């Protein structure tokens, strides 16, 4: 998955198919060439957008979970490839952005929770924290959510973060990529870059 990866620091975007990662990528980079669509799983390989002179890039990783017309074994392989990509490049990953659909994330997590099953979102969130990677959960499509505070509190609870969500604004970023409203995510990334003494990268998230 990383054969054509530019050799530079990066912020990775990951999440289920059809949560708006590619739309968010367009908002973050100002580049319109990323593939988006209604059909889940449009992105099947990493999309890199790099600034060669700055040695920095955003990477949109393939969507995981359900994809129309894709066998279960292939879906699992995609998730495995994502994990391997992150493990292989962890030293260059400045931050990970786990994108979820604000309207359906809690319901999907609950549906796939059980004695023998860990929801992919929870599994990957825990994986990122175990790697000690700065992680932001971008709760996308928040404009479609009623009772936003309750939904965000419930999401925090599922992620193992004690509500209320407002105390986790460095980790929980409610956004609407389609409407261009991504300031909470930009502010969270600004804080991460500042902590890493990478003020040279602040211009990419303002």
Swiss-Prot record:
Amino-acid positions noted as binding Mg(2+) in the UniProt annotation, renumbered to this chain: 22, 43
Molecular functions per Gene Ontology? GTP binding; metal ion binding
> Keywords assigned by UniProt?
Cell cycle, Cell division, GTP-binding, Magnesium, Metal-binding, Nucleotide-binding, Septation
The UniProt record gives the binding positions of GTP as 15-22, 41-45, 60-63, 140-143, 175-177
Transmembrane intervals: none
Q: Which InterPro entries match?
A: G_ENGB_dom (IPR030393), GTP-bd (IPR006073), GTP-bd_ribosome_bio_YsxC (IPR019987), P-loop_NTPase (IPR027417)
**Could you tell me which Pfam families the record lists for this protein?**
MMR_HSR1 (PF01926)
Q: Which cofactor does it need?
A: Mg(2+)
Where does the EngB-type G domain start and stop, copy by copy? 7-195
* Gene Ontology terms describing biological process: cell division
Q: Does the keyword Nucleotide-binding apply?
A: yes
Among its keywords, does the record have Electron transport?
no
Query: Please, which domain of life does this record's source organism belong to?
Result: Archaea
Q: What does this protein do?
A: Necessary for normal cell division and for the maintenance of normal septation.
- Which family is annotated? Belongs to the TRAFAC class TrmE-Era-EngA-EngB-Septin-like GTPase superfamily. EngB GTPase family.
NCBIfam families hit by this protein:
PRK04213.1
- Per its record, how is this protein called by name? Probable GTP-binding protein EngB
Please report the organism this UniProt entry assigns to the protein. Haloquadratum walsbyi (strain DSM 16790 / HBSQ001)
Q: Which gene encodes it?
A: engB
């Amino acid at each position: 998955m990383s054969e054509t990866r530019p050799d530079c620091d990066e912020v990775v975007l990951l999440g289920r198919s059809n949560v708006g990662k590619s739309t968010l990528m367009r908002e973050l980079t100002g580049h319109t060439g990323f593939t988006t669509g209604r059909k889940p799983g449009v992105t099947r390989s990493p999309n890199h957008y790099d600034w060669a002179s700055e040695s920095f890039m955003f990477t949109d990783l393939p969507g995981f979970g359900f994809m129309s017309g894709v066998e279960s074994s292939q879906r699992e392989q995609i998730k495995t490839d994502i994990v391997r990509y992150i493990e292989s490049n962890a030293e260059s990953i400045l931050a990970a952005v786990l994108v979820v659909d604000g309207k359906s994330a809690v319901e999907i997590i609950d549906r796939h929770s059980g004695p023998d099953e860990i929801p992919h979102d929870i599994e990957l969130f825990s994986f990122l924290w175990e790697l000690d990677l700065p992680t932001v959960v971008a709760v996308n499509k928040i404009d479609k959510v009623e009772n936003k505070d309750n939904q965000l509190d419930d999401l925090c609870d599922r992620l193992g973060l004690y509500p209320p969500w407002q105390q986790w604004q460095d980790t929980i970023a409610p956004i609407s990529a389609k409407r261009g409203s991504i300031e909470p995510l930009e502010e969270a990334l600004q804080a991460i870059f500042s902590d890493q003494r990478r003020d040279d990268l602040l211009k990419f998230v303002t």
